[in-house]
Amino acid sequence: MKFKWDEFFVTGDPLILGAQVSIALSTIAIIFVLTYFKKWKWLWSEWITTVDHKKLGIMYIISAVIMLFRGGVDGLMMRAQLALPNNSFLDSNHYNEIFTTHGTIMIIFMAMPFLIGLINVVVPLQIGARDVAFPYLNNLSFWTFFVGAMLFNISFVIGGSPNAGWTSYMPLASNDMSPGPGENYYLLGLQIAGIGTLMTGINFMVTILKMRTKGMTLMRMPMFTWTTLITMVIIVFAFPVLTVALALLSFDRLFGAHFFTLEAGGMPMLWANLFWIWGHPEVYIVILPAFGIFSEIISSFARKQLFGYTAMVGSIIAISVLSFLVWTHHFFTMGNSASVNSFFSITTMAISIPTGVKIFNWLFTMYKGRISFTTPMLWALAFIPNFVIGGVTGVMLAMAAADYQYHNTYFLVSHFHYVLIAGTVFACFAGFIFWYPKMFGHKLNERIGKWFFWIFMIGFNICFFPQYFLGLQGMPRRIYTYGPNDGWTTLNFISTVGAFMMGVGFLILCYNIYYSFRYSTREISGDSWGVGRSLDWATSSAIPPHYNFAVLPEVKSKDAFHHMKEEKTELYPESKFKKIHMPSNSGRPFFMSVAFGIAGFGLVFEWYWMGVVGLIGVLLCMVLRSFEYDNGYYISVDEIKETERKISE
């Protein structure tokens, strides 16, 4: 790649200029606030170096909300461009860049970290653990994700964004058709963030299998913990495929290899297969934790034990197996034989069976329950019909012959948004509101929360339901404009109105966070909603102390905390207090991730010397870690008593 210094910063577009100015002003404002209030030491010692799973979860969620804003703005710009025929709001290249970054950010840098953030906050509490199995690795996982996300996101102001679509199909992603650093940003940003996700998968799989409290057998685990365990197993098997695929495509672009080009025996379809062998399990990586969140919320606010617990566990395991057997349905039209298409058509339809089982589990859980229509419960109730719409249209797409009509039309776009927004995004909002007191010590305002729910949910349906009909009328996806005689104007305009309603809903959520911080009553009890059934609500305060439990609880049944309340069990008798071992904070994961970022940035522009320097930094941090003998520290019984006394006051 012949790099030109006058092309280092992206110029010539007022939208990009506005973004550059806002980034500069925001950075200056953050530095000023931290300096003025003397918070640099606090930021370093309490957050950047923390190994506390709860704080890392909050950092994941904050990052995900920022990415939701960035990806949402991309989506609104796309809808603004398509609102009217022959619109010139965006040119074709800018639209392709936004289309690419929107999909990548929402899947990789918003949905996954949001769910991983909730997992970090909740799962160790649900299994009665003090922290995760590998706290140091947990910090490293976050910072590699964050650095990968930042590397990807600076592309739109430095060098130029990727524009080959979020799937980066070859040969479109080759140097010939996508010159410049944009596609390199995609490959290296995802690679670095993917390393962090793989480490998270290993960490939480070990945590759940090895660190459950006394009496918590696998079949007594909360459903959110079960879905997390299965999700982590999928991550461990799926993400190495993505890692290898990204590495091979990087070799094609950076070093002239031919893994995915027809020259020298390469095969473009190899990329499509590798991408979707990871890509479809990825769908279940972001949907299974959502199922767990809805299970916790529905069971809690229906005040009933989850119906069909064993069937629920079996269906989750079945989905995890089938998720690796359906990837070819993403390219039924690309020349596979009839027998291959038939096999993957059958497996795709089969995966709807265990998914359907869970729908009935939730419905029967609510049957004859004393339901409280809180904001989290409203999101859970909205999820069921909207997700079913997405699922039914998914079965339609699973029919290989019919897919020749639906493929690459807006019918498909509507389908996966009904699955991913109604499934994953609704769950992120529901879980965020449900466990908000566990993170910040107070609830979000219910009245404002319900305004957010209704505006966003109605806007979602106004935006995406018309797209089914646009697809049936032949509107292809990924086009940046259309003619007035195509007959798509009215439905596209309606869809755009719905998209901006969703944007208004997001702003209401942000206002709710501010309003609740100022005016909400601070929670005293660890059971903030009064309907808690699992151990995450059994803590002695709304925000758990850093050691989580003064005495590790003993579990005797499913819904352990619910039964403890019924039996009036004393949770934390002082006679059982013992000194608690906790891990020490460390700044090395941060520096190692920065080194990853330096290496990635250098390789984006093919400055190999910078790439080597960055990788040497990574190796140096690993060597220093191997000579580290810090085994953590102990919290004395007196300190535990003092902490618990302050909590109870």
Curated annotation (Swiss-Prot):
Catalytic reaction equation(s): 2 a quinol + O2 = 2 a quinone + 2 H2O
Q: Which PROSITE patterns match?
A: COX1, COX1_CUB
Where along this sequence does the record place binding of Fe(II)-heme a? H102, H417
Q: What is one Gene Ontology biological process annotated in the Swiss-Prot or TrEMBL record? A: respiratory electron transport chain
Q: Where in the cell is it found?
A: Cell membrane
Q: According to the UniProt entry, what is the EC number of this protein?
A: 1.10.3.-
| Family statement drawn from the similarity comment of this UniProt entry | Belongs to the heme-copper respiratory oxidase family.
A molecular function (GO) term:
heme binding
Q: Which CDD domains does the UniProt entry name for this protein?
A: Ubiquinol_Oxidase_I
Residues bound to Cu cation: H280, Y284, H329, H330
Q: Where is this cross-link: 1'-histidyl-3'-tyrosine (His-Tyr)?
A: H280-Y284
Annotated heme a3 binding sites: H415
Which residue ranges does the entry give as Extracellular-facing topology?
1-13, 77-104, 161-187, 250-273, 327-342, 398-415, 473-492, 604-606
The UniProt entry, under InterPro entries, shows:
Cyt_c_oxase-like_su1_dom, Cyt_c_oxase-like_su1_sf, Cyt_C_Oxase_1, Cyt_c_Oxase_su1_BS, QoxB
Please give the cofactor(s) recorded in the UniProt entry for this protein.
Answer: Cu cation; ferriheme a
Cytoplasmic-facing ranges: 35-55, 126-139, 209-228, 295-305, 364-376, 437-451, 514-585, 625-649
Keywords (A to Z) from UniProt = Cell membrane, Copper, Electron transport, Heme, Hydrogen ion transport, Ion transport, Iron, Membrane, Metal-binding, Oxidoreductase, Respiratory chain, Transmembrane, Transmembrane helix, Transport
One Pfam family matching this protein: COX1
The protein depicted here goes by the name Quinol oxidase subunit 1
